[in-house]
Amino acid sequence: MKIERVNDNTVKFFITYTDIERRGFARDEIWYNRERGEQLFWQMMDEANEKESISFEGPLWIQVQAFEKGLEVTVTIAKTTIDGEQVDEDELDSLLRSAMSDAEEKETELSQDVLFETTDFEHIIALSQYAEAPIFEEVKTSLYQKDGLYLLHLHFKEETEVEEQENVMSLIAEYLNFSEQTIHPVAEYGKVIVPNDVFAFIRKHFPN
């Protein structure tokens, strides 16, 4: 799970479905079993408190966005409610169900082309040091720059198993954010930084 502290009051999480399952939660039960869904949510909060020393006390405003690979959860700690809205247990349950509906529509199959993004090149350098595992042999990589973002493009072989693809994306999601952009406009209007074998190139030119 990736934890990003946006400011003093806001924290953003990204957790892949693979990570959710590794934590002992079945993908379906977190949506349809209220108690299990809340257990996962507060487990994420506890991890943020442990790693970032964030105390989640007081009213919380929560936004859940579903992607085909996982969930992005934005939590804002407020002294007062935001836009008159405050999330209680029933609303948390409703948010999770809504996110699941969106995810089911997107999750028919994993795309062969996936984009990750970051504004900090150091994150790509750090990731590259851990991207020598055999699972990365199944993916082609290229790196672009566009609108102030570094965009890492992954292209998986057609025969790549879904579990292997999710394992790769789960590791990368610890360092970079999933991008909602698609490769075609990025390739057309962005600047190519590294055309292929991104991780090997970065390790060679930016040794740890």
UniProtKB/Swiss-Prot annotation:
Gene3D superfamilies: 3.30.70.1950. It comes from the Bacteria. GO terms for molecular function: protein-macromolecule adaptor activity. Enables the recognition and targeting of unfolded and aggregated proteins to the ClpC protease or to other proteins involved in proteolysis. Homodimer. HAMAP family: MecA. The N-terminal domain probably binds unfolded/aggregated proteins; the C-terminal domain interacts with ClpC. Belongs to the MecA family. This is Adapter protein MecA. It comes from Exiguobacterium sibiricum (strain DSM 17290 / CCUG 55495 / CIP 109462 / JCM 13490 / 255-15).
